[in-house]
C-alpha cells in the first residue's frame, strides 16, 4: 500500500501545533484517536539518528485524555485496569493496561493521579471514553467523565534535559521518571511529566492553555538551537528497537496481558476488583499459548500494512509479524511478532513471504536494545 493524501472532514481533528509542524516539513500523518498524528519529517532513519543524539519536539496531542472525577472515580479507574492502584500517589504516572470482561486488552494508557478524586487516563488509540462511561452507568458510579482540552507536546532525546532546564530551571531536572509537577511559563502553569514514547529520555507537557502552549512550542525551538533541536514524532525504528509496544499494531482486543509481556502489571493476588479478573486467573493457570517476541529477518527493507504470517519449515503458520522496520543498528529488518508457544524460544528459525520471496528469520528476545 502506498502513502496517500488524507481528506479533510469534521471527523478529522487537527492540533494546536498543526500549522507549525507543516511549516517545519511534516511529510506524513497517521490518524490516532480521530486526530492527526505526525508520522514522518522526511527520512525516518535520519530522524532516528537525530532523536538518539539531540532533542526533538513532538506534536502528540493525539494522545487524548479521559478525565474521571468524583467520589467514585478511584473505584471506576481500578475497575478498568488489572494493575493495583490502591497505593497510588498524587503526582505520579502509572502504566495501566485496561482489560475487558474476557481478560483482553482494551488499551494501555498512562494514568495520572491528579487528586484523590481526579484522574487523567492518557490513552493509546481506542475510544476508552465510551468504555468508561458504560462501566460508570452500569455500576451507577458517582463520577464525571469528559475529554478535557489537553494537547500534549513531547520533548524527547538526550539533550531534552538541558533544554528543559534552560526554560524551566533546575527543578525540572529533579523530576523522577513517571513523576509530574506544575511548572511556570510566562505566568501559566503547565503540568509536565518525565515521560514520553521513546527510550531516549524526556518530558511530556500536558497543555491546557492553548495559547501558552503554542508560545512554549515556539520558545523551545528558539532557545533550543544550541542543542540542535528539531521537529519529530514517535519513531518507528526507535520504538521497535526499544520494544515500546503500540496498541492496534503490536496487540489489540484479541490479546491478553500475559501474551504481551505485561505480567508485572497484572495484580491477581491483591483484593482489588477489576473487570476480567477471574478470566485472567484462568489464563494464567493454563499459561499463554502465544507471546509477543522479537524477530530478525534477513532483508534490508520492508513495508508492512496489516500483519504477515510466519511459517515453520513445514509451512505451518506459527505466528504473525505485526510491526517491522529496517534497523541501522542491526543492518537488517527487525520486528515484533506474535509467536506460538511451540516456536517462541530465542534463535528459533522461521520463514516469511515478502514480495513473493521466501525469507528466513529468527526469533529473539525483546527489547532489541
Curated annotation (Swiss-Prot):
Where do the annotations place (6S)-5,6,7,8-tetrahydrofolate binding? 122, 204, 206
Q: Mind listing the GO molecular function terms for this protein?
A: methyltransferase activity
Q: Which keywords fit this entry according to its UniProt record? A: Methyltransferase, Transferase
Q: Which reaction does it catalyse?
A: S,S-dimethyl-beta-propiothetin + (6S)-5,6,7,8-tetrahydrofolate = 3-(methylsulfanyl)propanoate + (6S)-5-methyl-5,6,7,8-tetrahydrofolate + H(+)
Q: How does activity depend on pH?
A: Optimum pH is 7.0-8.0.
Q: Which GO terms describe its biological process?
A: methylation
Recorded hits in Gene3D superfamilies, A to Z, give: Probable tRNA modification gtpase trme, domain 1
Known EC number(s)? 2.1.1.269
One Pfam family, short name:
GCV_T
Q: How is its activity regulated?
A: Non-competitively inhibited by MMPA, weakly inhibited by substrate analogs dimethylsulfoniobutanoate and dimethylsulfoniopentanoate. It is used as an intracellular osmolyte.
Its biological purpose is as follows:
Major contributor to the demethylation of dimethylsulfoniopropionate (DMSP). Demethylates DMSP to methyl-mercaptopropionate (MMPA).
Q: What else is known?
A: DMSP is used as an intracellular osmolyte, predator deterrent and antioxidant.
Description of how the protein assembles with itself and partners: Homodimer.
* Family assignment from sequence similarity: Belongs to the GcvT family. DmdA subfamily.
Supply the PANTHER family for this chain: AMINOMETHYLTRANSFERASE, AMINOMETHYLTRANSFERASE, MITOCHONDRIAL
**What's the name of the protein?**
Dimethylsulfoniopropionate demethylase DmdA
Task: Please report the organism this UniProt entry assigns to the protein.
Answer: Pelagibacter ubique (strain HTCC1062)
Amino acid at each position: 500500500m502506498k502513502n496517500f493524501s488524507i481528506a479533510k472532514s469534521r471527523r478529522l481533528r487537527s492540533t494546536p501545533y498543526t500549522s507549525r509542524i507543516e511549516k517545519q516539513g511534516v511529510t506524513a500523518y497517521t490518524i490516532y484517536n480521530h486526530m492527526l498524528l505526525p508520522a514522518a519529517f522526511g527520512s525516518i532513519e535520519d530522524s532516528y539518528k537525530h532523536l538518539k543524539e539531540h532533542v526533538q519536539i513532538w506534536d502528540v496531542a493525539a494522545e487524548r485524555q479521559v478525565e474521571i472525577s468524583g467520589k467514585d472515580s478511584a473505584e471506576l479507574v481500578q475497575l478498568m485496569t488489572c494493575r493495583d492502584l490502591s497505593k497510588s500517589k498524587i503526582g505520579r504516572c502509572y502504566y495501566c493496561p485496561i482489560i475487558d470482561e474476557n481478560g483482553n486488552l482494551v488499551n494501555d494508557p498512562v494514568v495520572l493521579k491528579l487528586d484523590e478524586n481526579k484522574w487523567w487516563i492518557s490513552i493509546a488509540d481506542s475510544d476508552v471514553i465510551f468504555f468508561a462511561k458504560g462501566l460508570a452507568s452500569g455500576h451507577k458510579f458517582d463520577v464525571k467523565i469528559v475529554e478535557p482540552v489537553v494537547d500534549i507536546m513531547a520533548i524527547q532525546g538526550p539533550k531534552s534535559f538541558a533544554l528543559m532546564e534552560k526554560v524551566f530551571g533546575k527543578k525540572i531536572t529533579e523530576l523522577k521518571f513517571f513523576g509530574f509537577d506544575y511548572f511556570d511559563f510566562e505566568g501559566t502553569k503547565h503540568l509536565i511529566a518525565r515521560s514520553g514514547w521513546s527510550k531516549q529520555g524526556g518530558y511530556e507537557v500536558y497543555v491546557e492553555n492553548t495559547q501558552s502552549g503554542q508560545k512554549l512550542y515556539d520558545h523551545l525551538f528558539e532557545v533550543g538551537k544550541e542543542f540542535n533541536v528539531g521537529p519529530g514524532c514517535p519513531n518507528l525504528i526507535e520504538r521497535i528497537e526499544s520494544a515500546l509496544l503500540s496498541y492496534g499494531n503490536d496487540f489489540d482486543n484479541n490479546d491478553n496481558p500475559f501474551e504481551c509481556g505485561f505480567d508485572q502489571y497484572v495484580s491477581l493476588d491483591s483484593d482489588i476488583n477489576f473487570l476480567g479478573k477471574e478470566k485472567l486467573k484462568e489464563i494464567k493457570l493454563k499459561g499463554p499459548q502465544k507471546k509477543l517476541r522479537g524477530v530478525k529477518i534477513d532483508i534490508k527493507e520492508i513495508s508492512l500494512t496489516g500483519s504477515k504470517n510466519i511459517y515453520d519449515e513445514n509451512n505451518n503458520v506459527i505466528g504473525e509479524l505485526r510491526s517491522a522496520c529496517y534497523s541501522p543498528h542491526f543492518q537488517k529488518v527487525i520486528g515484533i511478532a506474535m509467536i506460538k508457544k511451540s516456536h517462541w524460544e530465542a534463535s528459533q528459525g522461521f520463514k516469511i513471504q515478502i514480495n513473493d520471496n521466501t525469507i528466513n528469520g529468527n526469533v529473539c528476545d525483546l527489547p532489541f536494545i
